[in-house]
Protein backbone atom coordinates (compact mmCIF):
# COMPACT_ATOMS: atom_id res chain seq x y z
CA UNK A 1 0.00 0.00 0.00
CA UNK A 2 2.84 2.40 0.75
CA UNK A 3 4.30 1.96 -2.75
CA UNK A 4 0.88 2.38 -4.34
CA UNK A 5 0.13 5.49 -2.27
CA UNK A 6 3.50 6.98 -3.21
CA UNK A 7 3.05 6.24 -6.93
CA UNK A 8 -0.45 7.72 -7.07
CA UNK A 9 0.82 10.72 -5.12
CA UNK A 10 3.51 11.32 -7.76
CA UNK A 11 0.92 11.20 -10.56
CA UNK A 12 -1.38 13.64 -8.74
CA UNK A 13 1.53 15.98 -7.97
CA UNK A 14 2.56 15.99 -11.64
CA UNK A 15 -1.01 16.86 -12.66
CA UNK A 16 -0.94 19.77 -10.19
CA UNK A 17 2.50 20.94 -11.38
CA UNK A 18 1.55 20.80 -15.06
CA UNK A 19 -1.74 22.66 -14.55
CA UNK A 20 -3.83 19.68 -15.63
CA UNK A 21 -5.41 18.96 -12.24
CA UNK A 22 -8.83 20.42 -13.05
CA UNK A 23 -8.91 18.94 -16.56
CA UNK A 24 -8.04 15.36 -15.65
CA UNK A 25 -10.23 12.53 -14.45
CA UNK A 26 -8.27 10.14 -12.25
CA UNK A 27 -9.78 6.70 -11.66
CA UNK A 28 -8.14 4.10 -9.46
CA UNK A 29 -9.67 0.69 -8.91
CA UNK A 30 -8.72 -2.94 -8.89
CA UNK A 31 -10.19 -5.61 -11.10
CA UNK A 32 -10.19 -8.20 -8.31
CA UNK A 33 -9.51 -8.74 -4.63
CA UNK A 34 -6.26 -9.99 -3.17
CA UNK A 35 -5.03 -13.40 -4.31
CA UNK A 36 -5.39 -15.99 -1.59
CA UNK A 37 -3.43 -19.03 -2.96
CA UNK A 38 -5.45 -21.37 -0.72
CA UNK A 39 -5.30 -24.03 -3.43
CA UNK A 40 -1.53 -24.11 -2.88
CA UNK A 41 -1.85 -24.40 0.87
CA UNK A 42 -1.00 -20.74 1.41
CA UNK A 43 -3.06 -17.87 2.75
CA UNK A 44 -0.93 -14.89 1.81
CA UNK A 45 -3.62 -12.20 2.09
CA UNK A 46 -6.93 -11.50 3.76
CA UNK A 47 -10.09 -9.97 2.37
CA UNK A 48 -12.02 -10.50 5.59
CA UNK A 49 -14.90 -10.26 6.21
CA UNK A 50 -15.35 -11.01 2.51
CA UNK A 51 -15.15 -14.59 1.32
CA UNK A 52 -12.10 -15.74 -0.64
CA UNK A 53 -10.23 -13.53 -3.09
CA UNK A 54 -8.97 -12.77 -6.57
CA UNK A 55 -9.94 -14.89 -9.57
CA UNK A 56 -13.15 -15.98 -7.86
CA UNK A 57 -16.64 -14.49 -7.96
CA UNK A 58 -17.02 -14.49 -4.18
CA UNK A 59 -17.20 -10.99 -2.70
CA UNK A 60 -13.50 -11.14 -1.80
CA UNK A 61 -12.76 -11.46 -5.51
CA UNK A 62 -15.12 -8.88 -6.99
CA UNK A 63 -15.92 -6.29 -4.31
CA UNK A 64 -13.13 -3.76 -4.67
CA UNK A 65 -12.86 -0.03 -3.94
CA UNK A 66 -12.77 2.65 -6.59
CA UNK A 67 -11.44 6.17 -6.14
CA UNK A 68 -12.38 8.85 -8.65
CA UNK A 69 -11.05 12.39 -8.66
CA UNK A 70 -12.39 15.09 -10.96
CA UNK A 71 -12.12 18.53 -9.33
CA UNK A 72 -15.07 20.80 -9.99
CA UNK A 73 -17.26 17.89 -11.05
CA UNK A 74 -17.15 15.36 -8.22
CA UNK A 75 -17.11 16.52 -4.61
CA UNK A 76 -13.91 15.53 -2.80
CA UNK A 77 -14.32 13.20 0.16
CA UNK A 78 -17.66 11.80 -0.97
CA UNK A 79 -18.21 8.13 -0.14
CA UNK A 80 -20.65 6.30 -2.37
CA UNK A 81 -21.72 2.71 -1.75
CA UNK A 82 -23.41 2.25 -5.15
CA UNK A 83 -22.19 -0.89 -6.86
CA UNK A 84 -20.29 -0.25 -10.08
CA UNK A 85 -18.75 -2.58 -12.60
CA UNK A 86 -15.78 -1.89 -14.88
CA UNK A 87 -18.21 -1.78 -17.82
CA UNK A 88 -19.59 1.47 -16.34
CA UNK A 89 -16.32 3.33 -16.86
CA UNK A 90 -16.73 3.94 -20.61
CA UNK A 91 -20.24 5.47 -20.53
CA UNK A 92 -19.37 7.48 -17.41
CA UNK A 93 -16.21 8.89 -19.03
CA UNK A 94 -18.12 9.75 -22.21
CA UNK A 95 -20.61 11.73 -20.13
CA UNK A 96 -17.89 13.42 -18.05
CA UNK A 97 -16.13 14.44 -21.26
CA UNK A 98 -19.37 15.98 -22.56
CA UNK A 99 -19.93 13.46 -25.33
CA UNK A 100 -23.15 11.71 -26.29
CA UNK A 101 -23.63 8.03 -25.55
CA UNK A 102 -23.87 6.11 -28.83
CA UNK A 103 -27.45 5.60 -30.02
CA UNK A 104 -26.53 2.93 -32.57
CA UNK A 105 -24.82 0.62 -30.09
CA UNK A 106 -25.88 -0.86 -26.77
CA UNK A 107 -23.25 -0.41 -24.08
CA UNK A 108 -23.14 -3.05 -21.36
CA UNK A 109 -22.25 -0.45 -18.74
CA UNK A 110 -24.22 2.54 -17.48
CA UNK A 111 -23.39 6.19 -16.95
CA UNK A 112 -22.85 6.38 -13.20
CA UNK A 113 -22.25 10.14 -13.03
CA UNK A 114 -25.58 10.91 -11.29
CA UNK A 115 -24.74 8.39 -8.55
CA UNK A 116 -21.10 9.49 -8.30
CA UNK A 117 -22.07 13.15 -8.07
CA UNK A 118 -24.64 12.20 -5.39
CA UNK A 119 -27.39 13.68 -7.56
CA UNK A 120 -29.49 10.53 -7.61
CA UNK A 121 -29.39 6.94 -6.50
CA UNK A 122 -28.69 4.58 -9.38
CA UNK A 123 -31.58 2.60 -10.77
CA UNK A 124 -31.71 -0.94 -9.38
CA UNK A 125 -29.89 -3.21 -11.76
CA UNK A 126 -28.64 -6.73 -12.21
CA UNK A 127 -24.92 -7.52 -12.48
CA UNK A 128 -23.70 -10.65 -14.27
CA UNK A 129 -20.31 -12.25 -13.77
CA UNK A 130 -18.63 -15.14 -15.55
CA UNK A 131 -15.09 -16.27 -14.92
CA UNK A 132 -13.85 -19.69 -15.94
CA UNK A 133 -16.26 -22.12 -14.25
CA UNK A 134 -17.66 -19.48 -11.88
CA UNK A 135 -20.99 -17.75 -12.57
CA UNK A 136 -22.65 -15.10 -10.43
CA UNK A 137 -25.59 -12.72 -10.52
CA UNK A 138 -26.18 -9.79 -8.18
CA UNK A 139 -29.46 -7.92 -7.86
CA UNK A 140 -29.91 -5.65 -4.88
CA UNK A 141 -29.00 -7.47 -1.70
CA UNK A 142 -29.12 -10.92 -3.30
CA UNK A 143 -26.30 -12.74 -5.01
CA UNK A 144 -26.39 -16.03 -6.86
CA UNK A 145 -23.12 -17.99 -7.15
CA UNK A 146 -22.26 -21.20 -8.99
CA UNK A 147 -18.76 -22.66 -8.73
CA UNK A 148 -19.06 -25.12 -11.64
CA UNK A 149 -21.53 -25.32 -14.55
CA UNK A 150 -23.01 -28.67 -13.44
CA UNK A 151 -23.56 -27.60 -9.82
CA UNK A 152 -26.63 -25.82 -8.45
CA UNK A 153 -26.56 -22.10 -7.76
CA UNK A 154 -26.21 -20.89 -4.17
CA UNK A 155 -28.11 -17.81 -2.98
CA UNK A 156 -26.80 -15.26 -0.47
CA UNK A 157 -28.22 -12.14 1.19
CA UNK A 158 -25.27 -9.74 1.15
CA UNK A 159 -26.89 -7.34 3.61
CA UNK A 160 -27.16 -10.07 6.25
CA UNK A 161 -24.27 -12.31 5.19
CA UNK A 162 -21.42 -10.39 3.53
CA UNK A 163 -19.14 -13.40 4.11
CA UNK A 164 -21.41 -15.60 1.94
CA UNK A 165 -21.62 -18.45 4.44
CA UNK A 166 -25.36 -19.21 4.51
CA UNK A 167 -26.91 -20.58 1.31
CA UNK A 168 -30.55 -19.43 1.13
CA UNK A 169 -31.45 -21.28 -2.07
CA UNK A 170 -33.83 -23.74 -0.40
CA UNK A 171 -35.35 -21.07 1.88
CA UNK A 172 -36.00 -18.53 -0.87
CA UNK A 173 -36.94 -20.38 -4.08
CA UNK A 174 -38.73 -17.35 -5.56
CA UNK A 175 -35.58 -15.18 -5.57
CA UNK A 176 -33.48 -18.19 -6.62
CA UNK A 177 -35.71 -18.81 -9.65
CA UNK A 178 -35.83 -15.11 -10.61
CA UNK A 179 -32.05 -14.79 -10.57
CA UNK A 180 -31.52 -18.13 -12.34
CA UNK A 181 -33.89 -16.98 -15.09
CA UNK A 182 -32.10 -13.63 -15.35
CA UNK A 183 -28.79 -15.49 -15.69
CA UNK A 184 -30.18 -17.84 -18.36
CA UNK A 185 -31.55 -14.86 -20.32
CA UNK A 186 -28.22 -13.01 -20.05
CA UNK A 187 -26.25 -16.11 -21.09
CA UNK A 188 -28.49 -16.51 -24.16
CA UNK A 189 -28.14 -12.81 -25.04
CA UNK A 190 -24.35 -12.91 -24.78
CA UNK A 191 -24.19 -15.99 -27.02
CA UNK A 192 -26.21 -14.32 -29.81
PLM-predicted stretches and their roles:
Residues 66-68:
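Short glycine- and hydrophobic/aromatic-rich loop-to-beta-strand nucleating segment
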Amino acid sequence: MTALDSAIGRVLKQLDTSGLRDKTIVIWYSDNGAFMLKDRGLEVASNKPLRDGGVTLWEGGIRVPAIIRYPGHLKAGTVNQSPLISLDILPTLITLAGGPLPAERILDGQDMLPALAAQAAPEPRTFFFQYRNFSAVRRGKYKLVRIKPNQPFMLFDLEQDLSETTDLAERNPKVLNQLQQAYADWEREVAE
